Design a protein with these regions (language model features):
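Conserved catalytic core of the tyrosine transesterase superfamily
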Residues: 1-208
Length: 208
């Protein structure tokens, strides 16, 4: 008896070509509302994590695995840092503003962290640093704290916040691409949720 192989119709991913579940960035007033509330409650770790998440624009997997040596030289917090991204295996550079440096310095001093220590260590015994899941829960608490619906926000909210503000001010897609560490400009266009025609028009006007 001849057996024929069972041919299956190739499945197309349900979300192919669609922008599904994009998490909105925080508005400037929301950034300050969260920051001030955390400062009033003397939540040193949260202030440092919040500020660095905004400045660095890193994916959660890269943010939670940062070590002190990645952002500091001895006792001095660097104004700029560079890491190798886990997803793309490519380097990305980010700025650390003065208020973020101050909050990080305060946190490191409070915890007496060494250069080889993880910047945000976990309280759990099975992990040396906070997990991406823990970080996501923290982000949800931040937005809930100022009355926002936490189901609409996530860790990508933190990654998108500063680049969205920069984009609205400059319309410079190439700069945003570099800041996010994207290899393709198309990825940046989709990440920001920009209309393709508008994006291409602006990209044509951007000298790189």
């Amino acid at each position: 008896m001849l057996y024929l192989p069972l041919l299956r119709k190739p499945q197309i991913p349900w979300n192919k070509g669609k922008l599904i579940g994009q998490k909105p960035p925080l508005k400037l007033r929301e950034i300050w509302a969260i920051r001030i509330q955390l400062q009033l409650e003397n939540r040193t770790k949260d202030v440092a994590l919040f500020n660095l998440a905004i400045d660095s624009k890193l994916r959660s997997c890269d943010l939670v695995t940062l070590k002190v040596r990645d952002i500091a030289n001895g006792n001095t917090i660097l104004p700029r840092a560079m890491i190798l991204q886990q997803k793309t295996k490519k380097p990305v550079q980010f700025e650390i503003t003065e208020q973020t440096r101050e909050s990080l310095s305060k946190w490191i001093s409070l915890q007496r962290l060494e250069t080889s220590d993880y910047l945000f260590p976990s309280r759990l015994h099975d992990s040396d640093h906070i997990s991406t899941r823990q970080y996501a829960r923290i982000v949800h608490k931040w937005v809930e704290m100022i009355g926002l619906d936490s189901t609409l926000y996530g860790t990508h909210t933190m990654r998108r916040t500063k680049v969205t503000l920069i984009y609205h001010r400059t319309k410079n897609l190439r700069a945003i691409q570099l800041l996010l560490g994207h290899t393709k400009l198309e990825s940046t266009v989709r990440y920001l949720g920009i209309e393709v025609d508008d994006a291409l028009e602006m990209a044509e006007q951007t000298e790189v």
